[in-house]
Amino acid sequence: AADEFRDLYGCKLVISRAGADVMRERPELVYLKASPNPYATLFTPDLELEDGQVLTLGNTSIRCVLTPGHSPGVMSFFFDTCEDGRTYHVGYFGGAGFNTLYREKLLADKLPLTMRETFLESLQKVREYPVDVVLGNHPRQNETLAKREQMLRQPGTNPFVDPGEWKRFVDELTGQFKEFMEAGN
C-alpha cells in the first residue's frame, strides 16, 4: 500500500536506514506474505533515516531515534506540539511489543539473541527524554480511548499531558520484558 499512497498523494516514503537494510537483505523478515492485505508489498523508500536525524514536516521537527529490539530498524519519534500557548514534548516508542523477541522466534528468523538486550538498551536510551505526552503503539498501551473519553466528559482537561507517564511507561515495559525473559521465553 505504501507505493499506492506515494502514487495517489505524492508523499515521500520514509523508513530508518536499518529498516531499509532489512527490506533489502532479509525481506522475509518483513512478514508481508502472512498478511491478508493484497497491498502489503515491499517498497523502495524515498528517504532512509539515520539515528538522531531530524525530519521537518511543515513547522514540526521530529527527532528520529533508532531504538532496535522489536525489529532491527525500529525508530522512536519525539516532537513538540502546542496547545493554548503552551509547548508540550511528545514521545512515541517505536516498537513496544515482545512478540518478535521469543527465543524460538529469534532463532527461527536467524536473528541474534542479543536483540533482547538491544531492546532493553533501547528503552534506557530514551528513558530520560523529556516527554509530556506519550503516544502508544496501540490504544491500550497508554489508555488512549479512556483519556479521550475523559476529555469529552470533562471539557478543559487534558489527561494526555502527563510529564511522568513516559518514565513510568519505559520502566513498566522494562520490568515486563525482564519478567518475560526470566520466564524462559
Regions found by a protein language model. Give the residues of each.
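C-terminal regulatory/interaction regions
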Residues: 155-185
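Active-site HxH/HxHxD metal-binding segment of metal-dependent hydrolases
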Residues: 1-54, 153-154, 161-162
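Structured helix-beta-strand junction loops
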Residues: 8, 129-130, 176
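Intrinsic structural disorder
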Residues: 11-12, 85-87, 185
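Metallo-beta-lactamase
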Residues: 43-46, 54-56, 61-165
